[in-house]
Amino acid sequence: MNVNSSSNRGEAILAALKTQFPGAVLDEERQTTEQVTITVKINLLPDVVQYLYYQHDGWLPVLFGNDERTLNGHYAVYYALSMEGAEKCWIVVKALVDADSREFPSVTPRVPAAVWGEREIRDMYGLIPVGLPDQRRLVLPDDWPEDMHPLRKDAMDYRLRPEPTTDSETYPFINEGNSDARVIPVGPLHITSDEPGHFRLFVDGEQIVDADYRLFYVHRGMEKLAETRMGYNEVTFLSDRVCGICGFAHSVAYTNSVENALGIEVPQRAHTIRSILLEVERLHSHLLNLGLSCHFVGFDTGFMQFFRVREKSMTMAELLIGSRKTYGLNLIGGVRRDILKEQRLQTLKLVREMRADVSELVEMLLATPNMEQRTQGIGILDRQIARDLRFDHPYADYGNIPKTLFTFTGGDVFSRVMVRVKETFDSLAMLEFALDNMPDTPLLTEGFSYKPHAFALGFVEAPRGEDVHWSMLGDNQKLFRWRCRAATYANWPVLRYMLRGNTVSDAPLIIGSLDPCYSCTDRVTLVDVRKRQSKTVPYKEIERYGIDRNRSPLK
């Protein structure tokens, strides 16, 4: 891609890196003025990632593998770092992995944020992160064959269903709080929802000592499906379906990744329309979570009222794109349909109505003593991890739309509720500005050139955090590799730290404050580390206890 070197970001960081590690960088390739991929010597991979992460304000949203044996004879691992210091940019650190040994040095001992990504690379490609502290499977089930790795190019057809290798659960749950505690899992996971998960809460009396959990029970294989059965244009509509709540955010992230790879300039009006729909999506997501927050503290009147107002955001989506869910609008290079004058006026009317409704509901919410009493001081997250890609790396039209960055110092459940309240009002203001200031440009860029094996990142600040996609184009209008990372993928690993030191009745509030992308955790295993006894109970029972705080499920 032709990038004007005078406007390239990250050059000072790369110069410092090359000085710190002479000869470490083997290759350097620009995707955009704000994205660069460097190939480094594999033995220096942990040193380079650690240096960028700690010395240059790096953040590690995503890492992934790729089977590039048909391109260069190797596998590859990519660590995508968001540089958030004075010079904001993306630096992707790549290392080639020998196809025979399949070994590469684990980054996790240096940068713990890499643990889930390296476990997934091990599952999906059979690569071996030497020194990885947690050797458990992440994505693949217990009964999956040891020598079958789904994302290898020669491994399997996505339709293959291998015979199970075991008929029992073998996943070892870990209790870091008390290594002597005996864990006795009771009963199988009973799947009653689309997205189940299995939690283990290790408790001493009512206090949570540690927590562990197993997810990925309904892994859909979307990346394999995209690479084998779809053209890169068709994947746009698959990306819409990654999540039932923030599907449009994934669609923007995916199209943005391909547009960055091919150097496509998206018309400004399309950028504005994308931003409008992203804020509509943020509205209905935040209002949903505010309603659930009311429910978790026993304030079901607030739950019903927030869901009543949320209906107006769904009406807004239907008005703008013809569907109550924000599906099917994006194309690579722009959007499929315009926002006409009558739609704009009706949307502005809904914005005014929602602002009045939400103001009244928030006043009622904050006047409910149980809300602050139950949510302050629990589920604390370190304030240093707070970030918002709309500000750090503006995309779509976020560089032009006025917006406010909201932070609360508590880092607890109450702070997360209040950030959603403030962002709801800000989304309404952003919608008004964008609808009143729509540029007069085309909606779609057409006639661009397809470049096999071009690649780039795309990203969006979804309601739950950042969605980050990476796309490498292949031959015949297909994708060679698509990495789709949802916001909750990065939120789950920190949950155990949020739960520690809190009580069992706090668990639903803490989990709900992340607004995780899963339908229901059907069962929770409670392990009493003092009595060395365990009990498996329905999650609804834990939720009930969190609301009324009577009849403990531990007894």
Where in this protein do the model-derived segments appear?
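Metal/cofactor-centered catalytic core regions of large enzymes
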Residues: 45, 112, 138-555
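Terminal low-complexity/charged segments
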Residues: 1-207, 367, 371, 427, ...
